[in-house]
UniProtKB/Swiss-Prot annotation:
Protein name, UniProt field: Photosystem I P700 chlorophyll a apoprotein A1
Subcellular location: Plastid, Chloroplast thylakoid membrane
Higher taxonomy: Eukaryota, Viridiplantae, Streptophyta, Embryophyta, Tracheophyta
Subunit (UniProt): The PsaA/B heterodimer binds the P700 chlorophyll special pair and subsequent electron acceptors. PSI consists of a core antenna complex that captures photons, and an electron transfer chain that converts photonic excitation into a charge separation. The eukaryotic PSI reaction center is composed of at least 11 subunits.
Amino acids binding [4Fe-4S] cluster: 573, 582
Reaction catalysis annotation: reduced [plastocyanin] + hnu + oxidized [2Fe-2S]-[ferredoxin] = oxidized [plastocyanin] + reduced [2Fe-2S]-[ferredoxin]
Length: 750
């Protein structure tokens, strides 16, 4: 008699046809809420409609239904992203000078937008070189296209159509997985399978396929382009893929196929999988062979990582076990219960993901200039400045979002009854110590960092330069940063024996890469000026963290309002009869944190913009003499507040202020308009609700007098709505002002 172990039952992970597809609800604004569905009595209705349309928690408390809505919405988001990408590639195919740029990227600027003459705005079509007139773009798409081996506008056109097909596919998937085959809650909570697919599938196979594309398509095509071959003469991508002999002419080891791989003779492949470090002197970008090698290595790591977790086969790690075993001598119950939090609260999950993705985005910003990945990116100063600024802003917003969703988790999803002595509970119990210490750190950093500048301004004003903190008087050298630079500069051949150059030219070591007479990158000197501004960075970051963390830790209760959790995530004040309890909701902390995030990022991008123009970017003569854009004035000018105002903001604003009548004039208009949007925000931030309600009532009286009063009763914005409108315009105005200021300046001088 044979006893078989019972076969594991196949789990049914989807519900078929859970929700009927119908367009009826499209005609009922607010169908997700009983109150809003009744239609507008007052103008507050439209604000509530927008506030709650995507707040799925408020539509239903069923976690499975919420999960399905979020999942379906993600496909909609992907569809929009594909549509956007398609538009970018279509502009490259239809309106750009990509092929001309490809033939001479050092003298021709990238342009993919030509303005139509309607009221004379064709003045915006500046001469970007090579006889093409259009708007200079600074997104870095041309450089990415070249790195990926695109040689013609037809290829861009085909890719654009492909992206449209994918956009349609994503829309279909969003409908299908909500209306036809909607996943069950168990599927959303199966974290090990999710890790398997995301690590091994998305990151592992994704990196592997990119590495394959780079080796078989990008490398050979870029090899030809670098040698000056006309793009039209270069074989097409599929010819390299199908014909191994073509590749073997460029990389002889290709003739041996996969034999070296299976015989472990991997060094044969070092022709196209290199470990050089530094930059390619022809293009000023990282060696594409280094990049291919990197993606292959990343693919291996993630393919292994994706197979470490226990799925259908009963071997590997279980995440719950890992978390519950994670206890130290001083951490009580450790991470016990964290698994349940992260599988039942999407806000908790999103908060962690936003915090990590935000930090990663800021890391990307710093690597885009110090290790420029694409050919001819480093010498395109406008694109370099734009990419840095863009990734810094995005990172800042994501990190504030992390705090927002952490606070929503605390208010809506945290259950204090079954949490005792785990790490989260312990943090909450000593939150006063955390916040008061952080507050002390902010005060210390603020007074000392700003105090150094004030000292310098005072000494400068009194004509005592010998008593200033500067590289030529009282030095405050950033010795730790210089030590890190030196360590990295000395690494090749020592701690990184296989490398021929250090990871980034910025570390030091004396070499300089210039392309077409422009500096791509050189060692960046750090001195007293950097020491001062870095402490301003420390100050602004700590204040941002103080505000956001206080919002999270006191989201449910505080000494002032012990029952805060029952008031919800956003509320203006703790009801009538309790003065001094306004601006305490978790939402208000996010609101206030946004302003400090804006401060923090502004100082960073100003520092970057000036430092690069002063000490890195510039032209190089035949004799090897480098002339920087602002002639190295950062070290002596940025050590006073007056210097920042006079030699950075005012001096460099001249291009945007004087742009009228030139192809940069749109930036002049944006500069003006965005200042106006910013100023408009102050009207919402500085006045109270009652002022506007009073005004509205006079206006309604006038309408009644003329018998033109609307049926929907006008109401002033609620306090929270007013703040939301205020902060939105403040940030939008500030960011657009900075954008116009930076681009007009760098396109004119770079």
């Amino acid at each position: 008699m044979i006893i078989r172990s019972p076969e594991p039952e196949v789990k049914i992970l989807v519900d078929r046809d859970p929700i009927k597809t119908s367009f009826e609800e499209w005609a009922k604004p607010g169908h997700f809420s009983r109150t809003i569905a009744k239609g507008p009595d007052t103008t507050t209705w439209i604000w509530n409609l927008h506030a709650d349309a995507h707040d799925f928690d408020s539509h239903t408390s069923d976690l499975e239904e919420i999960s399905r809505k979020v999942f379906s919405a993600h496909f909609g988001q992907l569809s929009i992203i594909f549509l956007w990408l398609s538009g970018m590639y279509f502009h490259g195919a239809r309106f750009s000078n990509y092929e001309a740029w490809l033939s001479d990227p050092t003298h021709i600027g990238p342009s993919a937008q030509v303005v139509w003459p309607i009221v004379g705005q064709e003045i915006l079509n500046g001469d970007v070189g090579g006889g093409f007139r259009g708007i200079q773009i600074t997104s870095g798409f041309f450089q990415i296209w070249r790195a990926s081996g695109i040689t013609s506008e037809l290829q861009l056109y085909c890719t654009a159509i492909g992206a449209l097909v994918f956009a349609a596919l994503m829309l279909f998937a969003g409908w299908f997985h909500y209306h036809k085959a909607a996943p069950k809650l168990a599927w959303f909570q199966d974290v090990e399978s999710m890790l398997n697919h995301h690590l091994a599938g998305l990151l592992g196979l994704g990196s592997l396929s990119w590495a394959g594309h780079q080796v078989h398509v990008s490398l050979p095509i870029n090899q030809f382009l670098n040698a000056g071959v006309d793009p039209k003469e270069i074989p097409l991508p599929h010819e390299f893929i199908l014909n191994r002999d073509l590749l073997a002419q460029l990389y002889p080891s290709f003739a041996e196929g996969a034999t070296p791989f299976f015989t472990l003779n991997w060094s044969k492949y070092s022709e196209f999988l290199t470990f050089r470090g530094g930059l390619d002197p022809v293009t000023g970008g990282l060696w594409l062979t280094d990049i291919a090698h990197h993606h292959l290595a990343i693919a291996i790591l993630f393919l292994i990582a994706g197979h470490m977790y226990r799925t259908n086969w009963g071997i590997g790690h279980g995440l719950k076990d890992i978390l519950e075993a994670h206890k130290g001598p001083f951490t009580g119950q450790g991470h016990k219960g964290l698994y349940e939090i992260l599988t039942t609260s999407w806000h908790a999950q999103l908060s962690l993901n936003l915090a990590m993705l935000g930090s990663l985005t800021i890391v990307v910003a710093h690597h885009m200039y110090s290790m420029p990945p694409y050919p001819y990116l480093a010498t395109d100063y406008a694109t370099q400045l734009s990419l840095f600024t863009h990734h810094m802003w995005i990172g800042g917003f994501l990190i504030v979002g992390a705090a927002a969703h952490a606070a929503i988790f605390m208010v809506r999803d945290y259950d204090p009854t079954n949490r005792y002595n785990d790490l989260l509970d312990r943090v909450l119990r000593h939150r006063d110590a955390i916040i008061s210490h952080l507050n002390w750190a902010c005060i210390f950093l603020g007074f000392h960092s700003f105090g150094l500048y004030i000292h310098n301004d005072t000494m400068s004003a009194l004509g005592r330069p010998q008593d200033m903190f500067s590289d030529t008087a009282i030095q405050l050298q950033p010795v730790f940063a210089q030590w890190i630079q030196k360590t990295h500069a000395l690494a090749p051949g020592v701690t990184a024996p296989g490398e021929t150059a250090s990871t980034s030219l910025t570390w030091g070591g004396g070499e300089l890469v210039a392309v077409g007479g422009k500096v791509a990158l050189l060692p960046i000197p750090l001195g007293t000026a950097d020491f001062l501004v870095h402490h301003i960075h420390a100050f602004t970051i700590h204040v941002t963290v103080l505000i956001l963390l206080k919002g999270v830790l006191f989201a449910r209760s505080s000494r002032l309002i012990p029952d805060k959790a029952s008031l919800g995530f956003r509320f203006p004040c703790d009801g009538p009869g309790r003065g001094g309890t306004c601006q305490v909701s978790a939402w208000d902390h996010v609101f206030l944190g946004l302003f400090w995030m804006y401060n923090a990022i502004s100082v960073v991008i100003f520092h970057f913009s000036w430092k690069m123009q002063s000490d890195v970017w510039g032209s190089i003569s035949d004799q090897g003499v480098v002339t920087h854009i602002t002639g190295g004035n950062f070290a002596q000018s940025s050590i006073t507040i007056n210097g920042w105002l006079r030699d950075f903001l005012w001096a460099q604003a001249s291009q945007v202020i004087q742009s009228y009548g030139s192809s940069l004039s749109a930036y002049g208009l944006f500069f003006l308009g965005a200042h106006f949007v910013w100023a408009f925000s102050l009207m919402f931030l500085f006045s109270g609700r009652g002022y506007w309600q009073e005004l509205i009532e006079s206006i309604v009286w006038a309408h009644n007098k003329l018998k033109v009063a609307p049926a929907t009763q006008p109401r002033a914005l609620s306090i929270v709505q007013g703040r939301a409108v205020g902060v939105t315009h403040y940030l939008l105005g500030g960011i657009a002002t900075t954008w116009a200021f930076f681009l007009a300046r760098i396109i004119a001088v770079g």
